[in-house]
Swiss-Prot record:
Pathway in which the depicted protein is active: Secondary metabolite biosynthesis; terpenoid biosynthesis
Function summary: Polyprenyl transferase; part of the gene cluster that mediates the biosynthesis of pyripyropene A, a specific human acyl-coenzyme A:cholesterol acyltransferase 2 inhibitor. The first step of the pathway is the synthesis of nicotinyl-CoA from nicotinic acid by the nicotinic acid-CoA ligase pyr1. Nicotinyl-CoA is then a substrate of polyketide synthase pyr2 to produce 4-hydroxy-6-(3-pyridinyl)-2H-pyran-2-one (HPPO) which is further prenylated by the polyprenyl transferase pyr6 to yield farnesyl-HPPO.
PROSITE patterns documented for this protein: UBIA (PS00943)
Originating species: Aspergillus fumigatus (strain ATCC MYA-4609 / CBS 101355 / FGSC A1100 / Af293)
Name listed for the protein in its UniProt record: Polyprenyl transferase pyr6
């Protein structure tokens, strides 16, 4: 039975269940915003001028729709996992697990966020091919919590794989919003593929570290997670994942990457991931959370790096 709350308390609870009071949802905005800036830079390099206010408007729409879609996904995840969350130290006080929020209110809130996200993506795409992109994203959100079940482990599927694929899929509508009908779908996919692979691998890496915080409770409750794959060699698994992330960056940059992106992306990320691997300690699961926060900082850094790349390619830095 949900606890009776004042309107102010209910608003705070709804913010809490969507993680809008934390940085987690902001991970979802990185692929779309990076992609808007990189796609706009690519078009400028091809001689197509895009007004700066138009590009920033598209980036704002990408930010807003992914943020709200992530919030809706958080509610769905917590509703499916509410009985498990109630038995895990880190998650037992979440609104649905603790009984602070009724299921009906949570579902309504989730649908409101989802509807707003659909509308914003439609605006970003100028009404073109909305459900071509939204349906795969929605499918990923629905499947994600079920990836934590022991049954999916038998199939070799881990929740990080689903989360990584969902994250990578937000790249496609962002590039499509910038290129419109000027590029055929197969060519657009070819342009996006390196960045999609990068997002898939990076998400698996930082979420493996993040989920390791719950290793004791997860083992007790048989919760499926990618670190289960490695047993006691979790550090080695994170090393392999980090190396894979770094190795994909030259694939992204080899065609159009400037000296700035080679430094700000490949150089900074290589150093940052090395520092994270040094920081992570299998004997102290809380270090997984610290690694996660450092990856959030990397995501913010890359937003700035991609924006500077756009300014460099478009010649906008000449005014400074």
């Amino acid at each position: 039975m949900a606890t009776a709350q004042s309107p102010t308390q209910l608003v705070r609870t709804l913010i809490d269940v969507s993680r809008f009071d934390k940085y987690n949802c902001l991970f979802a905005i990185f692929p779309g915003v990076w992609s808007i800036f990189l796609a706009a830079a690519s078009r400028h390099a091809d001689g197509v001028h895009l007004p700066s206010d138009w590009v920033l408007g598209r980036a704002g729409l990408a930010f807003a729709y992914t943020y709200l879609l992530s919030g809706a996904g958080m509610v769905w995840n917590d509703w499916i996992d509410r009985d498990i969350d109630a038995q895990v130290a880190r998650t037992k006080n979440r609104p649905l697990a603790s009984g602070r929020l009724a299921t009906r209110a949570a579902i309504i809130w989730m649908l409101v966020q989802y509807a707003a996200s659909v509308w914003l993506m439609d605006r970003m795409l100028s009404g073109q091919n909305l459900w071509t992109f939204m349906l795969p994203l929605t499918t990923g959100i629905i499947l994600y919590p079920f990836g934590k079940r022991p049954t999916t482990r038998k199939l070799g599927i881990y929740p990080q794989y689903i989360l990584g694929a969902s994250s990578a899929l937000t790249i496609l509508p962002a590039w499509a919003s910038v290129y419109g009908d000027s590029v055929a779908p197969p060519d657009l996919l070819a342009k996006c593929l390196p960045l999609c692979v990068f997002l898939f691998l990076w998400t698996i890496y930082f979420n493996t570290a993040y989920s390791y915080q719950d290793v004791k409770d997860d083992c007790r409750l048989s919760v499926n997670s990618s670190y289960v794959l490695a047993g006691q060699y979790v550090h080695g698994l994170l090393l392999l994942q980090a190396v894979a992330v770094v190795m994909v960056i030259p694939w992204i940059l080899h065609e159009n990457g400037s000296a700035w992106l080679w430094f700000s992306w490949l150089g900074v990320w290589t150093a940052a991931l090395a520092e994270q691997l040094y920081l992570f300690d299998t004997k102290d699961p809380s270090t997984g959370g610290r690694v996660h926060r450092r990856n959030f900082a990397l995501g913010i850094w890359n937003v700035l790096a991609c924006f500077v790349e756009l300014l460099l390619v478009s010649g906008s830095l000449d005014m400074f």
